[in-house]
């Protein structure tokens, strides 16, 4: 990390027994000021007051939280972890972990690529098979589909990244460009920059 006051960098590694993994793929700062990190192979962990704490990597012996690709928080302070092949996990304020896998939710895949929860209630879930929305209050999940025609809603179903702006627009990065989707009743737009 970089200390602005001292103008120096500090290297933190697994070799120093400071963190559980050296392969960090995502980070998130929650409302309590904790810095969360997702890793390949050793799950999620967070830093608070200079100390790192690890989240359990197995749940009920059949769910693995080893490969965490994305992290976000809802308005209730629940932490959501998206994994590469094992779905979504919610850590509530009491430390309980709840899995949301394709077997339990009806999603087409357990490969979670990205999250956005800008309003604190609607968790937009990017996957290798489309974009879903979960209401974090009711836990209902729906696939965002194009109801106006037989065509797919998005140019590409593999969602790489999502950003929700202050207008409610979802900026969705895919392998074939960018889609802009609105959460209000306005048509979406597909944009391809410099491509075919």
Name every feature range the model reports, one short phrase each:
Residues 1-196:
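Carboxylate-rich, polar loop motifs that coordinate divalent cations or form catalytic acidic clusters
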